[in-house]
């Protein structure tokens, strides 16, 4: 009997937590992509889709079809589409050559990320300052295929 009560209590608490978390992720009740929250643990692939989850850090993979991919860890736990979010360092961003060469790993001190909905997808702008004072800018468009797979 005690086990049944514990299981029921656990299920009720879990359901309550899920409802509370879901309520925190939206500013209003419409289903617009503008109210989607990028959660800690999300992975993004430019020109492709939301394709993986990681438990340990916010992780995004920006690849606009050029010679180098851009891989970022940490910095912010969540960013709302349509708003500017501060990056809080220090954290690493790895620039990984797609040909398998050595990566470049600057330590980001501070900066911002702004994600806006545009015709054809999402515009992602990251402007940051490395610990050595050097400025870093990432400006890419996540195209329709990414947006379609957002959910």
Predicted regions and their residues:
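Edge beta-strand at a domain terminus
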Residues: 31, 127-151
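Sec-dependent bacterial lipoprotein signal peptides
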Residues: 1-22
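Extended, loop-rich substrate-binding clefts of extracytoplasmic carbohydrate-active enzymes
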Residues: 107-131, 135-137
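Bacterial Sec-dependent N-terminal signal peptides
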Residues: 16-45, 150-151
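Short, hydrophobic/aromatic-rich segments at coil-to-beta transitions
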Residues: 31-34, 57-58, 119-125
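Short, well-ordered strand-loop elements centered on a beta-strand within folded domains, enriched
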Residues: 89-90, 123-126, 151
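A detector of low-complexity, intrinsically disordered, Ser/Thr/Gly/Pro/Ala-rich segments
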Residues: 5-6, 12, 34, 41, ...
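Surface-exposed helix/loop patches within compact recognition domains
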Residues: 38-119
